[in-house]
Amino acid sequence: MTDLHSLLIAFILGVVEGLTEFLPVSSTGHMIIVGHWLGFVDEKAKTFEVIIQLGSILAVVVMFWRRLFGLIGIHFGEVPHEGHTAGRLKLTHILLAMIPAVVLGLVFHDVIKSLFYPQNVMYALVVGGFLLLAAEWLKPKKPRAVGLDDITHRQAFMIGCFQCLALWPGFSRSGATISGGMLVGVSRYAASEFSFILAVPMMMGATVLDLYKSWHFLSLSDVPMFAVGFVTAFLVALIAIKTFLKIIKRISFVPFAIYRFIVAGVVYMVFM
């Protein structure tokens, strides 16, 4: 593989990762499809995916840095209150939402990694699509938590339980958490913001664990390729998050569900 070819692959996968990581469409499903299409499916490819996820995480940190630092008691000016109640999103909300998936993820880490096959991803895309539809059709007519600061500890924990579904490769972490949030009475916009903020510790923890287990596949010659993928994923994710938060006020998740079904069909035709 030539250096130019490697950098092109890194750029393409960085775009795919950045576009899909925080949308309810499954970044894993897209990475598997595009990775197979590019012929980039070895152990180095898995390590590469872990590293470019850090670029996507950094995009969330840049978007919500005041809120994130505020959660740990470091304040850079006043964070605007989002909601109709006197509540405030606290670190305890995030910790409660993390517990279910962290416990299951640690216990079944090796089992989960063994599920990274197109057939499993295809099923997850379909089931996750139906969950998005269920969230739109069954959500309360009037959300109890309109803004991010209205979310209760109980709602945060329930969102965390839904997040466990994302341990199934191809399900979509954002799809599971946003759908779960809507079903327990959180507005679509607030559930999306909470999902993005929750992604930082969840993805960071999973990424560090994966990186620890696969660091021996790294070499200095891979640095340019990984750097291109990281930077590309960061920039594209930043644009994707900003755009998503704008359009989600005006559209439902039905188009995303339909898109998931289409991607599942592509997986079936290509890999089955």
UniProtKB/Swiss-Prot annotation:
Catalytic activity: di-trans,octa-cis-undecaprenyl diphosphate + H2O = di-trans,octa-cis-undecaprenyl phosphate + phosphate + H(+)
Superkingdom, taxonomy of origin: Bacteria
Taxonomic lineage from the root: Bacteria, Pseudomonadati, Pseudomonadota, Gammaproteobacteria, Enterobacterales
Species for this entry: Pectobacterium carotovorum subsp. carotovorum (strain PC1)
Protein name, entry field: Undecaprenyl-diphosphatase
GO MF, one annotated term: undecaprenyl-diphosphatase activity
Coiled-coil boundaries: none
Keywords: Antibiotic resistance, Cell inner membrane, Cell membrane, Cell shape, Cell wall biogenesis/degradation, Hydrolase, Membrane, Peptidoglycan synthesis, Transmembrane, Transmembrane helix
Compartment annotation: Cell inner membrane
Note from the entry: Bacitracin is thought to be involved in the inhibition of peptidoglycan synthesis by sequestering undecaprenyl diphosphate, thereby reducing the pool of lipid carrier available.
